[in-house]
Amino acid sequence: MKTSFLFFTVLILFFISASASEPAIWSVSSRSDILKGDARNVSIDSNGAVTLAPRLTEIYKTEQPYVWSSAVDAAGNVYLGTGGDGKVFKIPPGGSGSLFTDLAELNVSAVAVAANGDVFAATSPDGKVYRIDSAGKATVYFDAKEKYIWSLAVMADGSIAVGTGESGKIYRVRSANATPESSLLFDTSDSHIITLALDKAGNLYAGTDSNGLVLKF
């Protein structure tokens, strides 16, 4: 009797174990189906194809809610413009970052580095450009009298191109404390100059919102 009871107990446990180890099979037929899953270390393209993703490594946490902008100097130091406390952080090539300066503004929406190592940081919604020296001391370089400054670029002659909003104007600032009137490069009649970039020939390109234009100067 005990032998029979033991046999049936083992048999029941076997079937429970077998049932629990059965593989689950499902199929997906669209990108939206794939996106319902948790993508780990893979990329999903517009057609739903899954490929290995580049390895991502966290090197520094600013403890700020936003990182709005970044720039790299000749030595490989990375400067991060953040919000909403208006702080700029410096991360050397080794990755041990630290606070570079606190601008006492809301957002640092653009950062650029000049050839001499000076860092320029633009703020929003107060529309100012600060020059920051190697010690982290910041002074107002240009007051655009605009609500937003979205973009900066250092021109070949060292002047600073400044892209603004909400009036969509581009300024070229050649010296500290220059006025907006004397620095106006172009009024696009669009709302915002979201991005500025230079090519190897020194031509300036501007990308706008809300008409999505690309302008060359």
State where each predicted segment sits.
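Blade/loop signatures of beta-propeller domains
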Residues: 23-55, 130, 171
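Surface loop/turn motifs at the tips and blade-to-blade linkers of beta-strand repeat domains
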Residues: 59-63, 100-104, 141-145, 185-189
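Conserved beta-strand position repeated once per blade in WD40 beta-propeller domains
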Residues: 68-69, 109-110, 151, 195
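Residue-level detector of Asp-centered blade-edge/turn motifs that repeat once per structural unit
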Residues: 72-75, 113-116, 154-157, 198-201
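Conserved beta-propeller blade signature
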Residues: 77-80, 118-121, 159-162, 203-206
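Short loop/turn segments immediately following the C-termini of beta-strands
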Residues: 83, 124, 165-167, 209
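A short loop-to-beta-strand structural motif that recurs across blades of beta-propeller domains
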Residues: 87-90, 127-131, 169-172, 213-216
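Short loop/turn segments that connect beta-strands within beta-propeller blades
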Residues: 91-96, 132-137, 173-179, 217
